[in-house]
């Protein structure tokens, strides 16, 4: 009988390198927020990949970056705490962008603070976005940048190309161990955290670059509708830092907030498996990213 292997894999990389999309592709369900805006992941969400022979627990962290605010510093601290406690670090570098200072900075951080006994796998993401010769050129550049990688694996989370190969590579690097989670469980995040992330993702679609860093979502209340077994009421608040940002989220005559509500409600109904009434309110918490008390109140 084959020995069972299990362990924790942390995906790191600069913002917007496809880490959350890759997590969802590996798990086969939506457990991490995806957006075209950088630094949209706020919590270390664990996705779980099940097999008869192994179990991979994926930790999807915020993008590691040079911090400009207290929130940015806390997010970076979260990343470092996470990869100090994992078996494999998956460094994500996209195929469609040249290696830049941000990538080099992260590699240096891994060299200087990453645990010596942790396996490093480099994942070249978004290979569907460029021709094959550019993928090959990026693989060469990555091998020159990261000389201590156990493997370099090119993948496309969008098309699924080589995702199975990546799973095999990650599983092979795990130690022998038990199944930490029951079969069929895809994440250990509470439903309220996932709901807040889904609302946040819907609110980030098609807005200006500065908004992601200024938008937080708090679930105020979740309760079954009295007399209706098939309906759940979800009340949530979207916090921004300035009145001008409140206008961006709400839109003209509330049109954009209604679009956000429709998109988020559909995702939450899929998550909960039932009909949902979603009530969204937009509030201003001035400069919350730099205020320790407000950061704590908003879940950071």
Swiss-Prot record:
<keyword id="KW-0964">Secreted</keyword>
<dbReference type="GO" id="GO:0000028">
    <property type="term" value="P:ribosomal small subunit assembly"/>
</dbReference>
<dbReference type="InterPro" id="IPR005225">
    <property type="entry name" value="Small_GTP-bd"/>
</dbReference>
<feature type="region of interest" description="G2">
    <location>
        <begin position="39"/>
        <end position="43"/>
    </location>
</feature>
<feature type="domain" description="Era-type G">
    <location>
        <begin position="5"/>
        <end position="176"/>
    </location>
</feature>
<feature type="modified residue" description="N-acetylthreonine">
    <location>
        <position position="2"/>
    </location>
</feature>
<dbReference type="GO" id="GO:0005829">
    <property type="term" value="C:cytosol"/>
</dbReference>
<keyword id="KW-0007">Acetylation</keyword>
<feature type="region of interest" description="G4">
    <location>
        <begin position="125"/>
        <end position="128"/>
    </location>
</feature>
<dbReference type="GO" id="GO:0003924">
    <property type="term" value="F:GTPase activity"/>
</dbReference>
<keyword id="KW-0694">RNA-binding</keyword>
<comment type="function">
    <text>Exhibits GTPase activity. Binds RNA but is probably not involved in ribosome assembly in mycobacteria.</text>
</comment>
<dbReference type="GO" id="GO:0043024">
    <property type="term" value="F:ribosomal small subunit binding"/>
</dbReference>
<comment type="similarity">
    <text>Belongs to the TRAFAC class TrmE-Era-EngA-EngB-Septin-like GTPase superfamily. Era GTPase family.</text>
</comment>
<dbReference type="InterPro" id="IPR006073">
    <property type="entry name" value="GTP-bd"/>
</dbReference>
<keyword id="KW-0134">Cell wall</keyword>
<keyword id="KW-0342">GTP-binding</keyword>
<feature type="binding site">
    <location>
        <begin position="125"/>
        <end position="128"/>
    </location>
    <ligand>
        <name>GTP</name>
    </ligand>
</feature>
<dbReference type="InterPro" id="IPR004044">
    <property type="entry name" value="KH_dom_type_2"/>
</dbReference>
<protein>
    <recommendedName>
        <fullName>GTPase Era</fullName>
    </recommendedName>
</protein>
<dbReference type="Pfam" id="PF01926">
    <property type="entry name" value="MMR_HSR1"/>
</dbReference>
<dbReference type="Pfam" id="PF07650">
    <property type="entry name" value="KH_2"/>
</dbReference>
<keyword id="KW-0547">Nucleotide-binding</keyword>
<dbReference type="InterPro" id="IPR005662">
    <property type="entry name" value="GTPase_Era-like"/>
</dbReference>
<dbReference type="GO" id="GO:0005525">
    <property type="term" value="F:GTP binding"/>
</dbReference>
<feature type="region of interest" description="G1">
    <location>
        <begin position="13"/>
        <end position="20"/>
    </location>
</feature>
<feature type="domain" description="KH type-2">
    <location>
        <begin position="207"/>
        <end position="286"/>
    </location>
</feature>
<dbReference type="InterPro" id="IPR030388">
    <property type="entry name" value="G_ERA_dom"/>
</dbReference>
<dbReference type="GO" id="GO:0019843">
    <property type="term" value="F:rRNA binding"/>
</dbReference>
<feature type="binding site">
    <location>
        <begin position="60"/>
        <end position="64"/>
    </location>
    <ligand>
        <name>GTP</name>
    </ligand>
</feature>
<dbReference type="InterPro" id="IPR009019">
    <property type="entry name" value="KH_sf_prok-type"/>
</dbReference>
<dbReference type="InterPro" id="IPR015946">
    <property type="entry name" value="KH_dom-like_a/b"/>
</dbReference>
<dbReference type="GO" id="GO:0005576">
    <property type="term" value="C:extracellular region"/>
</dbReference>
<feature type="binding site">
    <location>
        <begin position="13"/>
        <end position="20"/>
    </location>
    <ligand>
        <name>GTP</name>
    </ligand>
</feature>
<comment type="subunit">
    <text>Monomer.</text>
</comment>
<dbReference type="InterPro" id="IPR027417">
    <property type="entry name" value="P-loop_NTPase"/>
</dbReference>
<dbReference type="GO" id="GO:0030313">
    <property type="term" value="C:cell envelope"/>
</dbReference>
<feature type="region of interest" description="G3">
    <location>
        <begin position="60"/>
        <end position="63"/>
    </location>
</feature>
<feature type="region of interest" description="G5">
    <location>
        <begin position="155"/>
        <end position="157"/>
    </location>
</feature>
